[in-house]
Swiss-Prot record:
Domain of life: Bacteria
Residues annotated for Mg(2+) 1 binding in this entry: E426, E433
HAMAP family to which the protein is assigned, alphabetical: Lys_tRNA_synth_class2
Disordered, as annotated region: 1-23
Binding site for Mg(2+) 2: E433
Annotated InterPro entries: Aa-tRNA-synt_II, aa-tRNA-synth_II, aa-tRNA-synth_II/BPL/LPL, Lys-tRNA-ligase_II, Lys-tRNA-ligase_II_N, Lys-tRNA-synth_II_C, NA-bd_OB-fold, NA-bd_OB_tRNA
Gene that this sequence comes from: lysS
Organism lineage: Bacteria, Pseudomonadati, Pseudomonadota, Betaproteobacteria, Burkholderiales
Subunit structure: Homodimer.
Coiled coil: none
Cofactor list: Mg(2+)
Protein name: Lysine--tRNA ligase
Cofactor binding annotation: Binds 3 Mg(2+) ions per subunit.
NCBIfam families: lysS_bact (TIGR00499), PRK00484.1 (NF001756)
Gene3D superfamilies: Bira Bifunctional Protein, Domain 2 (3.30.930.10), Nucleic acid-binding proteins (2.40.50.140)
């Protein structure tokens, strides 16, 4: 018995490099094979039930030698996609990939019969096949299935990309994610890590006494964030609706209603730009806890993210884009001005307190301080924009930036000690915002006044300013306990945990322009 040299194994057809005419020819040939299968009877049988998966077999029998496998035969039934194939006269090898990994089939004419073996020679890479047989080791020691019964379950009509090059076109990876998942173990591992991270978050929240809830995706009034919404129409109610930009105001209504710890993991939609850090449809986790404040939230969020890293990656010390990222150490905490002076030490305290100086300085960065969003801009807003220009992108290590100005924090509780400042933080890691949280504003009259100021900004042309939500004000008028709330960007968090440079790498089906 011999085993194929893997370097010589028949490669999958290199779709990414094939001219359209060649690919069409391959597809036509495969359609002819499918037509022949239809004439023979059931072309897509659905009566095979696997008893094992590849990874579990390798884990359980990876160290079992051939004498032991012969002494106690292990019968298996396994199915998957044929990724490699080598026909050698009366015996052949095939590498089959299921949802857990790959395993080798050893197929002989004597075991499966003349007709099946002859048919197998014409099966194509990408076909879904099944086998029943026993485990054994080849001469080179590879754990394999000695096939006794072989079937074709699903005919693949399109050739797979070349095994050794995969999908070379990055956009094609996003557009045809199903192919990317077939040929790229790295992609599969990324989304497995995403699932582990989300499971960790849910488990952590449940252990801390939070109740998972679902709130509306269609809102009569967009709220909970400064963003431009997607607009749609509800035919039955004959009214304009908005895809939600954030669930915040509904979750806080639940706090008013007596659910003291709630969280939601779901989609938000913002009709804004696309970039390596932004996708119009993205996943957020928001959580709210009565009788807490932003300091408690920072501690809780830090532990939450650290544990998610451990559960998804096995460690809190990661490598991101070639640089170490240590989530095991205590996260830094800086005010906006402290962060500016850390990375741009030329600015003095006096300059950072001078609005005219800041406006002049921001113009050097190309900031239009006459834009509508600067209508109510105080010194805090100007400091924040300077922070964004000078410091934000340099916050590699996990850092909570605190003390955000009231005028850009319309839902946050004002500080009792520092005028114009709120009890708010944003968490930055690798120069990206990962989380945003604050002690919640529960003063109905103050909230109504802030909404009115937001409406003034919207009327002046600021598309991202908030609307006035009268029902939310009514809810606050019933009384909301002191509360802390936070939102974590799941996609950006998973980017860190999987060393992914682009947000579209961690979204299964990111938005792209239509092919036509």
């Amino acid at each position: 018995m011999t085993e194929p040299n893997r370097a010589q194994a028949a490669p999958a057809s290199p779709t990414a490099e094939l001219p359209a005419a060649d690919e069409n020819k391959i597809i036509a040939e495969r359609r002819e094979k499918l037509a022949a299968l239809r004439r023979q009877g059931v072309a897509f049988p659905n009566d095979f039930r696997p008893t094992h998966q590849a990874a579990a077999l390798h884990e359980q029998y990876g160290e079992t030698d051939q004498p032991a496998l012969e002494a106690t035969p292990v019968e298996v039934a396994i199915a998957g996609r044929m990724m490699l194939k080598r026909v050698m006269g009366k015996a052949s090898f095939a590498t089959v990939q299921d949802g857990s990994g790959q395993i080798q089939f050893y197929i002989t004419r004597d075991k499966v019969g003349e007709d099946v073996y002859a048919a197998f020679k014409h099966w194509d890479l990408g076909d879904i096949i099944s086998a029943r047989g026993v485990l054994f080791r080849t001469n080179k020691g590879e754990l394999s299935v000695q096939v006794q019964e072989l079937r074709l379950l699903s005919k693949s009509l399109r050739p797979l990309p070349d095994k050794f090059h995969g999908l070379a076109d990055q956009e094609m990876k996003y557009r045809q994610r199903y192919v990317d998942l077939i040929v790229s173990p790295e992609t599969r591992n990324t989304f497995r890590a995403r699932t582990k991270a989300m499971s960790s978050l849910r488990r952590h929240m449940s252990d801390a006494g939070f109740m998972e809830v679902e709130t509306p995706m269609l809102h009569p009034i967009p709220g909970g964030a400064a963003a431009k919404p997607f607009i749609t129409h509800h035919n039955a109610l004959d009214m304009q609706m908005f895809m939600r930009i954030a669930p915040e105001l509904y979750l806080k209504r639940l706090i008013v209603g007596g659910f003291e710890r709630v969280f939601e993991i779901n989609r938000n939609f913002r009709n804004e730009g696309v970039s390596p850090r932004h996708n119009p449809e993205f996943t957020m986790m928001e959580f709210y806890a009565a009788y807490t404040d932003y300091r408690w939230l920072m501690d809780f969020t830090e532990n939450l993210i650290r544990q998610a890293a451990i559960d998804a990656s096995g460690t809190a010390v990661l490598t991101y884009q070639g640089r170490e990222l240590d989530l095991s150490k205590p996260f830094h905490r800086l005010t906006i001005c402290q962060a500016i002076q850390k990375f741009a030490p030329q600015y003095t305290d006096a300059q950072l307190a001078d609005a005219d100086f800041l406006r002049t300085e921001l113009k050097k960065f190309g900031v239009n301080t006459s834009a509508p969003q600067f209508l109510n801009a105080g010194i805090g807003t100007l400091q924040l924009v300077l922070f964004e220009e000078t410091a934000e992108s340099q916050l590699w290590e996990p850092t909570f930036i605190v003390d955000y100005p009231v005028e850009v924090s319309p839902l946050a509780r004002a500080s009792d000690t520092v005028p114009g400042i709120t009890e708010r933080f944003e968490l930055f890691i690798t120069g990206r915002e990962i989380a945003n949280g604050f002690s919640e504003l529960n003063d109905a009259e103050d909230q109504a006044d802030r909404f009115r100021k937001q409406v003034e900004q919207k009327d002046a042309g600021d598309e991202e300013a908030m609307y006035y939500d009268a029902d939310y004000i009514r809810a606050l008028e019933y009384g909301m306990p002191p509360t802390g709330g936070c939102g974590i960007g799941i996609d950006r968090l998973v980017m860190l945990l999987t060393d992914s440079p682009n947000i579209r790498d961690v979204i299964l089906f990111p938005h792209l322009r239509r092919e036509d």
